[in-house]
Swiss-Prot record:
ATP binds at residues 330-337. This is Probable ATP-dependent RNA helicase DDX4. It is found in: Cytoplasm; Cytoplasm, Perinuclear region. Residues 21-35, 66-78 have a biased composition (Basic and acidic residues). Gene3D superfamilies: P-loop containing nucleotide triphosphate hydrolases. ATP-dependent RNA helicase required during spermatogenesis to repress transposable elements and preventing their mobilization, which is essential for the germline integrity. Acts via the piRNA metabolic process, which mediates the repression of transposable elements during meiosis by forming complexes composed of piRNAs and Piwi proteins and governs the methylation and subsequent repression of transposons. Involved in the secondary piRNAs metabolic process, the production of piRNAs in fetal male germ cells through a ping-pong amplification cycle. InterPro entries: DEAD/DEAH_box_helicase_dom, Helicase_ATP-bd, Helicase_C-like, P-loop_NTPase, RNA-helicase_DEAD-box_CS, RNA_helicase_DEAD_Q_motif. SMART domains: DEXDc, HELICc. Keywords: ATP-binding, Cytoplasm, Developmental protein, Differentiation, Helicase, Hydrolase, Meiosis, Nucleotide-binding, Phosphoprotein, Repeat, RNA-mediated gene silencing, Spermatogenesis. Residues 702-713 have a biased composition (Polar residues).
């Protein structure tokens, strides 16, 4: 028997053939290398030359590894279609067509006569369903009666075995479900609400080993909201299906109330100046007792180790309790999360809650939105801590996890919803929550939430049906940086009489962080980093780079040099991101190489060092990065590599940040700052502009120079924030 005699090699009476690929031929849940195969024009040729080509290669007529060419349905009715291992099948991409085959035979690895094939319709066989390994589905039709399986060796959207002969239409979802011997029976077609339209999908990853494994996101006959362009939630609507379900956090009381140890400089917070602008601001409080919180909240505050208010808490808590809108700007690690959670919980405990697990539609009273998955999960853990033992239930939803898991968490009862923008809009689009009861809308890292990355999503949110107007809800914004442009954008979200709280130097770095700048060329950075890390030893260190590829490259390099390192960035699966943070948090890997996805809000204990391997493009991002150390009165150190060829635009704002934080400024940096003309100290095309006071005062003192943070990030290197 010849090597290429495929038909004779397969015995239809034995168990299904499961091919074994080399380890690197399969990339897990993200699909495999076959799914990314692009076909040449000859591979997509249905004519005789195309067939002869593949017969010479050992494949039977009309088979290829390439992609099935896209065409209109009338071109498909009398022709066989080039597919994967058989007609109508493919390991690669397939174009847009309704896949109707009126004539011709579509065989897989073997032929099988059947009485079910009537009217010259095609049975679909092959490796994956679009046919299982043995049989495909009986009927194929456009619209909702699409073939039931679209699958794989393992049965994703179909299966390896026999496809269903009589697919069943799901009347609720407008989908036809097809089974398989090992099939999942999951829907193959999606209804957009009228029951007649098939939601076509194409592109990479449909069919092949392990199959599509995608999740169909549709509306319910109403508007279906799309997620943000930065890619955080796009996996819910295209590409491989997200199946990851994060493990639940520990439920024991000791784990819930595990808290950050305050540092030696915590008492210095009392000396920080605070400015409140706006009319009729309530007076600040000095102790938690003055807030008149309920006993349960006071007990939880004590268990969490809170004994003294930070400046942002002294001013923000009474303002929120008074029902005023607030924009608060305070340095990193100064307790902003507790500043808005405690008064919101106090109101809920006093006024009662509306959402419960016994209601069909959950209507949370509070929505908290943050730009990154890690930050929103951190806020949720704080909300769970302070609401312990109360009737208030906090829920967290974010991208990179199974959508069904998010929905299940919500339907069990949701009073406080912590979410990333993309997943939040998906849940709203699916009408899994109602917005009519919203009393509090909180934007954490608000400058990032309102810039060009997330601004459109936030505008969609406040214009959603049922969302109370800004006059009927309380809107709160918190961040360490509030550029002038962001303050102007915020007026669309806040009442006109909102209060502005500025704690210390707005946009300035924490003085508990010792900053050092080293002049290092691009090609000398790796060796310098290695030298520093070897001197540091096992002290916990975060290394920031600008691109996702470089994060993995540097992490691999350090591991090769026997330094335990992990990485986190937007291209890593959520499971991998959480594993990396866990390894770093618990000391398994003392070095974490990260991109901007980890720059904001992350509160990891005992981070002693931050190294800017690449300086960011904006000075406010620099402030957020170095704010991962020196938190809650603890001291830390930040080292930045300054490249003369790429970082000159940061010289002037960097000098200003160092000076304001009472740090030593290197002579070479001052020379660059004052010899380089950047129209930004007088208005720049690069850099950042901070407002040290409320912009409603008519004028503001600029702390640093540069370009507005509303500038769009580099689309090549931008993070998948959500």
């Amino acid at each position: 028997m010849g090597d290429e005699d495929w038909e004779a090699e397969i015995n239809p009476h034995v168990s299904s053939y499961v091919p074994i690929f080399e380890k690197d031929g399969y990339s897990g849940e993200n699909g495999d290398k076959f799914n990314r195969t692009t076909a040449s024009s000859s591979e997509m040729d249905d004519g005789p030359s195309g067939r002869d080509h593949f017969m010479k290669s050992g494949f039977t007529s009309g088979r290829s590894y390439g992609k099935r060419d896209a065409g209109e349905s009338n071109k498909r009715e009398n022709t066989s279609t080039t597919g994967g291992f058989g007609v109508g099948k493919s390991f690669g991409n397939r174009g847009f067509s309704n896949n109707r085959f009126e004539d011709g035979d579509s065989s897989g690895f073997w032929r099988e006569s059947t009485n079910d094939c009537e009217d010259n319709t095609t049975r679909n066989r092959g490796f994956s369903k679009r046919g299982g390994s043995r049989d495909g589905n009986k009927s194929e039709a456009s619209g909702p009666f699409r073939r039931g399986g679209r699958g794989s060796f393992r049965g994703c959207r179909g299966g390896f075995g026999l496809g269903s002969q009589n697919s069943e239409l799901d009347p609720d979802q407008g989908m036809q479900r097809g089974g398989g011997l090992f099939g999942s029976g999951r829907p193959a077609a999606s209804d957009t609400g009228n029951g007649d339209t098939y939601q076509s999908r194409s592109g990479r990853g449909r069919g092949g080993y392990k199959g599509l494994n995608e999740e169909v996101v549709t509306g319910s006959g109403k508007n279906s909201w799309k997620s943000e362009a930065e890619g955080g939630e796009s996996s819910d609507t295209q590409g491989p299906k997200v199946t990851y379900i994060p493990p639940p956090p520990p439920e024991d009381e000791d784990s819930i109330f595990a808290h950050y140890q305050t540092g030696i400089n915590f008492d210095k917070y009392d000396t920080i100046l605070v400015e409140v602008s706006g009319h009729d601001a309530p007076p600040a409080i000095l102790t938690f007792e003055e807030a008149n919180l309920c006993q349960t909240l006071n007990n939880n505050i004590a268990k969490a180790g809170y004994t003294k208010l930070t400046p942002v808490q002294k001013y923000s808590i009474p303002i929120i309790l008074a029902g005023r809108d607030l924009m608060a700007c305070a340095q990193t690690g100064s307790g902003k999360t507790a500043a808005f959670l405690l008064p919101i919980l106090a109101h809920m405990m006093h006024d009662g809650i509306t959402a419960s697990r016994f209601k069909e539609l959950q209507e949370p009273e509070c929505i908290i939105v943050a730009p990154t998955r890690e930050l929103v999960n951190q806020i949720y853990l704080e909300a769970r801590k302070f609401s312990f033992g109360t009737c208030v239930r906090a829920v967290v939803i974010y991208g990179g996890t199974q959508l069904g898991h998010s929905i299940r968490q919500i339907v069990q009862g949701c009073n406080i919803l912590c979410a990333t923008p993309g997943r939040l809009m998906d849940i709203i689009g699916k009408e899994k929550i109602g917005l009519k009861q919203i009393k509090y809308l909180v934007l954490d890292e608000a400058d990032r939430m309102l810039d060009m990355g997330f601004g459109p999503e936030m505008k969609k949110l406040i214009s959603c049906p049922g969302m109370p107007s800004k006059e009927q809800r309380q809107t709160l914004m918190f961040s360490a940086t509030f550029p002038e442009e962001i303050q102007r954008l915020a007026a669309e979200f806040l009442k006109s009489n909102y209060l502005f709280v500025a704690v210390g130097q707005v946009g300035g770095a924490c003085r508990d962080v010792q900053q050092a700048d080293l002049q290092v060329g691009q090609y000398s950075k790796r060796e310098k980093l290695l030298e520093i890390l070897r001197n540091i030893g096992d002290e916990r260190t975060m290394v920031f780079v600008e691109t996702k590829k470089k994060a993995d490259f540097i992490a691999t390099f350090l591991c090769q040099e026997k330094i335990s390192t992990t990485s986190i960035h937007g291209d890593r699966e959520q499971r991998e991101r959480e594993q990396a943070l866990g390894d770093f948090r618990f000391g398994k890997c003392p070095v974490l190489v990260a991109t901007s996805v980890a720059a904001r809000g992350l509160d990891i204990e005992n981070v002693q060092h931050v190294i800017n391997f690449d300086l960011p493009s904006t000075i406010d991002e620099y402030v957020h990065r170095i704010g991962r150390t020196g938190r809650c009165g603890n001291t830390g150190r930040a080292i930045s590599f300054f490249d003369l060829e790429s970082d000159n635009h940061l010289a002037q704002p960097l000098v200003k940040v160092l000076t304001d934080a009472q740090q030593d400024v290197p002579a070479w940096l001052e020379e660059i700052a004052f010899s380089t003309y950047i129209p930004g100290f007088s208005g720049s095309t690069r850099g950042n502009v901070f407002a040290s006071v409320d912009t409603r005062k008519g004028k503001s003192t600029l702390n640093t120079a540069g370009f507005s943070s509303s500038q769009a990030p580099n689309p090549v290197d931008d993070e998948s924030w959500d």
